[in-house]
Amino acid sequence: MKYSNWIALFSQSGREIVDITKRIDRVPDLIISNNNSGNIENYVDGVEYRWLTSSEEYTTLDILDEVVDDPENTLITLNGWLRIIPPDKCTKYNIYNGHPGLITKYPELKGHNPQYKAWKNIHKYDTIGSVVHRVVEEVDAGEIATEAEVSSANILTLFEMYDALRATSLKTWDSFLKEHLYNKV
């Protein structure tokens, strides 16, 4: 399915959203974050921003009920969003998460900090990678929409692994968003 509207959520720096927008030549219609210290608005022009300031706001995500006019035609992406999505939002909206762990091959990388889990046991993994999956109530259990992987043979440092996972993450988002978003004119 293709969506006309795109809402992106982040808790970290927002850098992934900046890089994705450059790759796909499309910006989100709205960016929601619980971290306004990243100054993402200086890097992505022409986007409405909403900053969540209380734990209730980013725990319930009721803001989605306020800003989404057409749930069937709206894609919501989690780009470094570090919060659990409430079950009612998982079923009501089309939400997809980028996960920097190749959970299709290594289900033990589900959940928090898969990069560190992989690094601790890098000798067990012949490849590393990222997925984009639908968000469901169970963490990292939704249908996989796309994945990308690279060999771990030449990864010698944690920083090299982070770089490789960042590249696979951008590749998965690039593929997924180009397939599922209409371009804005």
Name what the model sees in each region.
Residues M1-V185:
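One-carbon transfer enzymes
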